[in-house]
């Protein structure tokens, strides 16, 4: 029998700034700086990190590269939320994803991921019913078409310009939360362009 490590190399574990409260949601308390976050990621034995929200870490490639390399950390990806159900949000989402992808490409010698997600927590009905979503809380067929087209568009643009791969992170309080919604998302998107960042905590 083939062991997992013989195929993909030894398993390594990473963390992300959101574990320190540095994320897109408004939280109480004084945020801590990126240097402390990276120091503690390193000191607790993790081998990599996500980028965090734009501007949390340095946005100059050389500066970001220095901060990561000086701690022997690998940059694995960046979370980019977009309200995909509205077609008018796709162009702005593409611009943000490309800006983030360019930074990661230029700062690393690896192939980090763009991690797309819905703009979670912004719709009161989805937020109030998170964890107990019913079919009537979801998207219509026409909205799924718009949603999938937006994800494909951004993933295609990122791959074309930077060579980076895109995955999608399903999450509570967004339109891709339940097993049925995840299945519909996969049906509505192109697997050659976008993969799934499977989150066991939100399935």
Can you describe what each PLM-predicted range is?
Residues 19-21, 53-55, 81-84, 118-122, ...:
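Active-site-proximal loop/turn and secondary-structure-junction residues that shape catalytic pockets
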Residues 3, 74, 86-196:
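Active-site acidic/histidine proton-transfer and metal-coordination neighborhood
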Residues 1-110, 145-146, 152-153, 191-195:
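N-terminal pre-domain/capping segments
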